[in-house]
Design a protein with these regions (language model features):
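A cross-kingdom feature strongest in bacterial/archaeal respiratory oxidoreductases
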Residues: 2-105, 112-114, 119-123, 131-233
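Metal- or metallocofactor-binding catalytic centers and their adjacent structured scaffolds
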Residues: 127
């Protein structure tokens, strides 16, 4: 739902996510995010969260690691248990209903945010349904979202040359990309969920004096992992 997020004003007018962790804030609200797995620099993010005075953690799952930094944990329904709208890459709005009723005290995330807005006496939190949220974002009765293009507007990528050492190109397996997939036993047994490996060109392995198939310690910043070296030309 990346297009839906863009249409729904997810691009901030102020600091972006990285800046909010590089310059720690006093309070954070996390929704459906497990920073240890979902952020490119988890050490930076978790460090900022532990410094904060207040962290509100909203998730469909009780994430054990979040107990170290979350002050409040609010249960929200997964997308399968709530109504809503996705906008696909074509720009087509696709609305749906929940497959089953949310369990226990879980509520759809939009309802939790609405109540928080009401408690804080903020304007713009009077929604009574997910359809009302949709209609405000894309317009009532909209089938295709207008004004989309393939341009990379407002995005600047500055890459500094590396004179020494190695660069890590990380791949996130499709069945490890979100909290629900990570907790699906059947998905974790597929070929797409094999253990990660340190893949290197044959010449790089030779230069490092490493043989394919042996365990190697990979470090970046304060993090490290033991991976199996594999030749990949």
């Amino acid at each position: 739902n990346t297009v839906g997020g863009h249409v729904g004003w997810s691009l901030p007018s102020g600091a972006n996510a990285r800046q909010m962790f590089e310059q720690p804030r006093k309070a954070y609200v996390l929704m459906g995010l497990e920073p240890e797995f979902d952020c490119a620099n988890p050490q930076l993010v978790v460090g900022a969260l532990k410094q904060a005075s207040l962290v509100v953690f909203m998730s469909a799952f009780k994430h054990a690691a979040a107990l170290e930094y979350a002050d409040v944990m609010l249960p929200i329904a997964p997308y399968t248990e709530t109504s809503g709208t996705f906008v696909n890459i074509e720009g087509r709005a696709q609305s749906f209903n929940g497959v089953v009723k949310a369990r226990g005290d879980c509520r759809p995330a939009w309802k939790v945010l609405r109540v928080l807005g009401n408690v804080l006496n903020l304007d713009g939190f009077a929604y009574e349904s997910s359809e009302a949220v949709r209609d405000e974002v894309i317009g009532k009765g909209t089938e295709f979202v207008a004004g989309l293009d393939n341009g990379l507007n407002g995005v600047a990528i500055n890459l500094s040359p590396v004179s020494a050492g190695l660069q890590r190109i990380a791949d996130v397996p499709i069945n490890f990309a979100d909290p629900m997939a990570r907790r699906a036993p059947a998905l974790q047994q597929t070929a797409d969920s094999v253990a990660p490996a340190a893949r290197m060109n044959e010449k790089t392995l030779s230069k490092l004096g490493v043989s394919a198939g042996v365990p190697v310690r990979v470090k970046q910043g304060l993090g490290e992992a033991i991976l199996t070296a594999k030749m990949d030309n």
